[in-house]
């Protein structure tokens, strides 16, 4: 099973909180890094580096420039997972073991928002 959207959002929210101090509850897929979260370019690079480390992916600079929202990053990571399903399963196990509470909180919030 691939990493779920909720698990990726939880992981990205954790990274954003570490880099910027923004509360994970404020981070949703539609939020723009610049317009909504007020993240500057230096912080965005740090978020990208930590995302690469956490998810075992490489985000080229030209791709990073096109990732404008949290949802864009989620979609990008999911696309990379589809290209390498074995790595995605190992990644899912790692994320859930490191962030079970965060993953559960994001899942609950998304379920509430969709009602």
Swiss-Prot record:
Modification comment: 4'-phosphopantetheine is transferred from CoA to a specific serine of apo-AcpM.
Gene Ontology cellular component annotations, sorted alphabetically: cytosol; membrane
Keywords: Cytoplasm, Fatty acid biosynthesis, Fatty acid metabolism, Lipid biosynthesis, Lipid metabolism, Phosphopantetheine, Phosphoprotein
GO BP terms, alphabetized: lipid A biosynthetic process
Residues that bear O-(pantetheine 4'-phosphoryl)serine: 41
Signal peptide coordinates: none
Record's subcellular location: Cytoplasm
Domain of life: Bacteria
A Pfam cross-reference name: PP-binding
MF annotations from Gene Ontology: acyl binding; acyl carrier activity
Function: Acyl carrier protein involved in meromycolate extension.
Family label: Belongs to the acyl carrier protein (ACP) family.
PANTHER family in UniProt: ACYL CARRIER PROTEIN, CARRIER DOMAIN-CONTAINING PROTEIN
UniProt cross-references to HAMAP family, sorted A to Z: Acyl_carrier
Protein name: Meromycolate extension acyl carrier protein
Organism encoding this protein: Mycobacterium leprae (strain TN)
Organism ancestry: Bacteria, Bacillati, Actinomycetota, Actinomycetes, Mycobacteriales
